[in-house]
């Protein structure tokens, strides 16, 4: 598999503090976890693999339900934050690559892949192999969750350049979408106005339409795939749903 070193540092402390590590996103994660727990219908003590786990915001929420949670992420920075925030004995974090999951084969009742965390490898073949590897982490009958941005929606509102100001932070982003490969490349810069400290990151992800994602999940060993339009439980709208939730069962 292609070694995308940029993934390891994509969410450093500054990026994480404004997104996945922020208080607002922690509150959002609680709502999302509540929805998933009901949709997955897992038994008490079920084993969940949160992949990638980022700063552990969903892992912590799953732990509230007394599930045994393993959070895996390629970013040392994110894992460090997750461990500091951990309040539950039934959550364990470790460094790991989504393309190397053999040690987890058939060990989990559920695998969660949230916040558009799928599609980061260089080719469709590699991404497909990663999804198949996640499915193989499941016990027979286990369930996988994919929550990713809807390409149909994004292209309808696509902006190649944008910038935002949030209190003392300026964010500038430039993006390019390749209509042939369906990959979106972004260059993001975040600067703190007060301190002058800034960081820049490169981001490349394969975007999928709902039809593509459904087909891919079935090709990778999923059956009985259900789709929701959002974490409020609305039905999927193939054009306007922003981040659909796909739940499939291992055959």
Map each language-model feature to its residues.
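Conserved class I S-adenosyl-L-methionine
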Residues: 1-46
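Class I SAM-dependent methyltransferase "Motif I" SAM/SAH-binding loop
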Residues: 52-56
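Class I SAM-dependent methyltransferase SAM/SAH-binding core
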Residues: 57-100
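A short acidic, Gly/Pro-enriched loop at the edge of an enzyme's catalytic core
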Residues: 102-110
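A short SAM/SAH-binding and catalytic strip from SAM-dependent methyltransferases
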Residues: 109-125
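A short glycine-rich, Lys/Arg-flanked "PGG" loop and its adjoining helix->strand segment in the class I
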Residues: 128-140
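SAM-dependent methyltransferase
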Residues: 145-216
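C-terminal lobe and adjacent flexible extensions of AdoMet/dcAdoMet transferase-like proteins
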Residues: 210-251
